[in-house]
């Protein structure tokens, strides 16, 4: 009997039934299919950056909205970064900037200060330093939810692209929203004027639009411009309303520095927030700030790079400036950091990084208030002016915030006008 059982087992092994062979084959094919799908997902996931926690600012969303030109600009930019990294392996202070393909582990090894120094190329200004923290957050404006947020006079959507072959800046004014919502006047039509600063050269005037609350300009202008002029020139977009007496009345203006857009490498497209032209005269200097957000670490980094042309309070001829950065949530101060004091310098170079822990879920409820102040003997400091940056700000404050969200993990630097308190 034992021999018969052994022979039966041996026969099953040598010549298994047909249905068992089918089961084994189906299982093997299923495993191969699962492995193939997994490998395909891993391969395709390397084609784009990690998904953003904010879908509206995901890279694929921008490519879909603005076309393949964004993808082409990105492909041009990556070899340029790689070339910079390869050509700067000498002194540590001249390390190349990280590309978007660098892993999070390599970023963590660098540390936030070295990473920001690489991206901004701040070697001429010295080593990037960490800011000081301030404990006191008590002030009258701590409970204000509208501090420094200027009333906007509508928005305009523009795009710009620089043709390096013909040295031409192509500007498109696409559409506008809420352009003539003003209580003190009534306008039935409007038009837009584009000027090149600082020469006040008019480069284009749009056709008159009758429906000024939601309109499509669809205007294109070409401006001959040398590459070196991109570092010095600005564009001013001015909207004029036409009243009952057919007079042209300025209803809003916005200025955009070409140096902050990196136009030779990539086009720019976005919404600009118009402001009252009279408020533009309240500027008491300019400040260069860099923002970046790392979603994996939930870390917002603000770099106070430098300021220029500061105007002191009370007609003083000299002062010792420093900068305070407040993190606001719904207008309330959540955190405060400040830079070191620079002695008697209207054009101070700070080059200090400030790191805030910010969960992604509350990022859209936050804003930054950057205050330039004068150091005093009693330690309080007199405020010179401020800048508001965030989703509820206006002008360049909103543009800078949106650009940061559109390029997560990479620093975005812009100049801001410091407005009088």
Swiss-Prot record:
SUPFAM superfamilies: C2 domain (Calcium/lipid-binding domain, CaLB). PANTHER family: SYNAPTOTAGMIN, SYNAPTOTAGMIN-12. Belongs to the synaptotagmin family. The keyword Membrane applies. SMART domains: C2 (SM00239). One of its GO terms (cellular component) is plasma membrane. Phosphorylation of Ser-97 is required for mossy-fiber long-term potentiation. The chain crosses the membrane at residues 19-39. Gene3D superfamilies: C2 domain (2.60.40.150). Residues 152-272, 283-416 form the C2 domain. Synaptic vesicle phosphoprotein that enhances spontaneous neurotransmitter release but does not effect induced neurotransmitter release. Unlike other synaptotagmins, it does not bind Ca(2+) or phospholipids. Essential for mossy-fiber long-term potentiation in the hippocampus. Keywords: Cytoplasmic vesicle, Membrane, Phosphoprotein, Repeat, Synapse, Transmembrane, Transmembrane helix. It is found in: Cytoplasmic vesicle, Secretory vesicle, Synaptic vesicle membrane. Residues 40-421 are cytoplasmic. It is a single-pass membrane protein. One of its GO terms (molecular function) is calcium-dependent phospholipid binding. GO terms for biological process: long-term synaptic potentiation; presynaptic modulation of chemical synaptic transmission; regulation of calcium ion-dependent exocytosis; spontaneous exocytosis of neurotransmitter; vesicle-mediated transport. This is Synaptotagmin-12. Residues 1-18 are vesicular. The modification Phosphoserine is found at residues 97, 99, 214. The keyword Methyltransferase does not apply. Homodimer. Can also form heterodimers. Interacts with SYT1.
